[in-house]
Amino acid sequence: MMDAAKTSDDAGVAQRREGMRLLARATLGELSLAWDAIDDKPEVAPVRGPETGLVMVRGKIGGGGDPFNLGEATVSRATVRLSTGEVGHGQLLGTDKARARLAAIFDALFQSAAHRASVEALHEQVAARLDAEDRRKAEETAATRVDFFTMVRGED
């Protein structure tokens, strides 16, 4: 029975992690429209932030070398608590504190059964946009691709 509970918890953690990844990539417009579309908004209280800071980005040459400090990246984060008790966290690259706050709100709403469907709809919308952007970039890259080949020259 413990294994089934652990598997369920692991699936929930993975689902929330994927949701937080999508929220970090969502635009301010997408987040704002989704927030405005919610009718029964709970009260939101800040726990931390939103705040902006720096994190050290680490890298490895070839994926197998020793790690080294590549440089610093600006990040924004926020933590909020809903009036219904859920706590949400939002982290993203850049300095957009409003996006970090909204991402934290949607992370908290995702934990609420009453709002999960609207948050999942936002996740799907962001995922569709990201997939379209990836396809467009792949098509642009394919258009500039150069195929090299070697011709065997006969002896004269």
UniProtKB/Swiss-Prot annotation:
It catalyses: methylphosphonate + ATP = alpha-D-ribose 1-methylphosphonate 5-triphosphate + adenine. Coiled coil: none annotated. Signal peptide: none annotated. The keyword Transferase applies. Keywords: Plasmid, Transferase. Its EC number is 2.7.8.37. One of its GO terms (molecular function) is alpha-D-ribose 1-methylphosphonate 5-triphosphate synthase activity. One of its GO terms (biological process) is organic phosphonate metabolic process. Together with PhnH, PhnI and PhnL is required for the transfer of the ribose triphosphate moiety from ATP to methyl phosphonate. Belongs to the PhnG family. This is Alpha-D-ribose 1-methylphosphonate 5-triphosphate synthase subunit PhnG. The gene is phnG.
